[in-house]
Amino acid sequence: MECLHETLAQIVPADPAAAQRARKRWDSIAKPLHSLGLLEDAVVRIAAMTGSPNVELKPRAIVAMCADHGVVAEGVTQTGQEVTAIVTENMSRGDTSVCCMARVAGAELVPVDIGVARPVTGERILQRNLMRGTRNMTQGPAMDRETCVQAIETGVDVARSLCRSGVRLLGTGEMGIGNTTASSAVTSVLLGVEPERVTGRGAGLSTEGLNRKVTAIRAALERNRPDPTDPVDVLAKVGGLDLAGLTGVFLGGAACRTPVLVDGFISAAAALCAVRLCPAAGDYLLASHVSAEPAGQMLLDALGLTPFLRAGMCLGEGTGAAAVMPLLDMALAVYDGMATFEDIQVEAYQPLT
């Protein structure tokens, strides 16, 4: 397993010269300057990530980290913990929302059992279980620091393996009943914001359930006192195996100079952990959408990312990442295939000052 410190040392800032060449290509295309907005910006950023203006985004994969959370014992979810295992196995069968969307997007879905509470079966599931779910964080740390580091390194290894197999674009996703509670706790600590401001209803909590969720987060923070300057400490004490694994996927993608799509709230919380561990990792992130969860926009602001979509989505699983992949394909269709001003013998647009 790749050592976390070695991975962090291998992450370099994106290449501004490649970005400049990609922007020059866009500006030569026979259309008004910058008229495709974020789509142009994304291709330019991807060129900088890979170090080449010749951008390729296929093959592609969405990594879904699956894990359970002991905090569900506090009544913070509408459904029981058993749902995590059921949906993880359904992912292997191609029978969840993200599976349907990934097929349209031409992406391989890679479900990873990093911490599901019971053994799961399925040919497509990567068996990487480190714990049968985290402990109840209101009673003590969700996991020990060593296990948290192993979970991050597991995510790194999954990302590296996919990149070495030729994957040019990674998406992130997750499955874990209770993971919005852990994500809200992590976000509260890293952003220095009260739990009430970053905690939402998740998969359909009542007002009473939401109050229990906030109370549980407050109890966990009071009991564990996570260090906001140490993302590993935060993840270990009030996070989850799925969050730690996703943190590793972002770091592994960055180390391989491969763009990684941030999905929604949970994915963005993990992305912030990755960037706090290694600021240069932020150069390799693309925001798919802004989650409808209360902290969705806060996290993207902290990451300095602008989402492609504002669609009111809050499903998770990687559905936002899948939804954006066809948009990137359309951007590349223009970038690679459209005539230039020189080709059609028309005077090029000039930037106005």
Residue ranges and their predicted role:
Residues 1-353:
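N-terminal loops that bind phosphate or other acidic moieties
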